[in-house]
Amino acid sequence: GTAIIVLAGVLNALKVVGKRLEDVKIVQNGPGAAGTAIIKMLQVAGAKNIVAVDEHGILYPGRPAGLADHKEWLATVTNPEHLTGTLADAVRGADIFIGTSVAGALTTEMAATMAPDAIVFAMANPNPEIMPDAAKAAGVRVIGTGRSDFPNQVNNVLAFPGIFKGALSVRARDINPQMKMAAAKAIAGLIPEDELNEENILPKAFDPRVAPAVADAVAQAARES
């Protein structure tokens, strides 16, 4: 669920800053279940340069600190520039930071080394990897968190129940990547281009348009895939 909302947010944030998904460098901090799903989703959508970082630093094949189970695979499908080092090394020059890690993981100093017009999704709960005011002070253009008291809340409720409704309506046996992509694009598309801005990249959690739009898009994708 989170991966779908993150992709929707990323698509709209990229429009705000005028960059393309296939061109940007993305750092994903905390590649557990949610983080890994986000990486897969972004790659399906066309992201080419994703660097995954865990508590031992950047993931790369044969890392001395070791790679648990799924991270072995992640190391082979991410990090095309073969970076090594820490989170600070990874975020230098990055266009997007996506955190599913711990509070305070992204310092203001690190955020300041990101590329111009940087985008940050800091989703550690209850306290994000970096607070929105600190991110803005560091020059970040767009910041989303998991919290409802800040703009751009990444909330799973945007994906469900629309996805299930759409899948059930066409008796889909599973929810495939095409259906997830369709859901993300439907969510992103609910914000008209002229209303998109740094503080408005995702619909609100209880926007009544969300579930029907997602259900329709998912059903359509299920029929086509």
Give short role names for the model-derived ranges.
Residues 35-40, 111, 208-213:
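Short glycine/threonine-rich loop-to-helix capping motif typified by GTGT followed
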Residues 41-44, 65-68, 111-113, 134-138, ...:
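Short, glycine/charged-enriched secondary-structure capping and boundary segments
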Residues 83-137:
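Long hydrophobic segments that form regular secondary structure
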Residues 2-4, 35-36, 58-61, 104-108, ...:
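Flexible loop/turn segments at secondary-structure boundaries
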Residues 4-98:
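Glycine-rich phosphate/diphosphate-binding loop of Rossmann-like nucleotide-binding domains
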Residues 4, 32, 81-84, 88-91, ...:
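Conserved structured core elements
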Residues 52, 57-60, 214, 220-225:
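Terminal amphipathic helices with adjacent charged low-complexity linkers/tails
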Residues 1-2, 11-17, 23, 122-223:
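Adenosine-phosphate binding glycine-rich loop
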